[in-house]
Amino acid sequence: RLIFDHADLKIPVGASVGIVGTSGAGKSTVVDILLGLLEPSTGHIYADSVDVKEPGNYRKWLKNIGYIPQMIFMLDDTIRKNVAFGVPEDKIDENRLWEVLKEAQLDEFIKTLPEGLETGIGERGIRLSGGQRQRIGIARALYNDPEVLILDEATSALDNDTEAAIMESINRLHGRKTLIIIAHRLQTIEKCDIVYRV
């Protein structure tokens, strides 16, 4: 069966776009298509009028995307290595780390820690709260300065107050990043410029 039939989503550069719907409606399918994990049976994905599936374009497209899932994968390692995930130790940019931690509103908390960026977070980030883990995920997604930020139900496991605080951090990026926010709660996307219901 078709999940989407004649779907036409327009996402303007710098806009905040919400995609909302019930479980099983196809929200994650949209994300999987944008991330290239699924290929549409028909149709195309264009970024600035360029088909991202054309040879040579796909890698460029992915480099422009920062992804924040519901469950952030955490290394049993330091805050530094969790934010600069996948970056070789000698290539980690200290200034960039602090920039993205500030964007994620986690910098002040880290400055209070005796070991700062070298603080171990434990297995699956057990030494951090759910909100702090999500903020590490935000900082990680921002580290490589993507143009597009996709939040795939990134706040759905958080309590209302923590979700509101995380969304405040995200909404501060409005206009500087293109935000695609997948949610099942309307309050999560209340500040979006455009909302698609699936």
Would you name each region that the model predicts?
Residues 20-22:
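The feature captures the beta-strand-to-loop junction immediately N-terminal to the Walker
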Residues 35:
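Helix-to-loop junction immediately C-terminal to a conserved catalytic motif
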Residues 44-63, 164:
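ABC ATPase NBD Q-loop/coupling interface
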Residues 46, 62, 80-123, 167-168, ...:
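ABC ATPase nucleotide-binding domain helical subdomain, centered on the C-loop/LSGGQ "ABC signature"
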Residues 143-147, 176:
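A short, proline-enriched helix->beta-strand linker immediately N-terminal to the Walker B motif
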Residues 149-152:
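Catalytic Walker B motif of ABC-type/P-loop ATPase nucleotide-binding domains
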Residues 172-181, 189:
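Conserved catalytic loops of ABC-family nucleotide-binding domains
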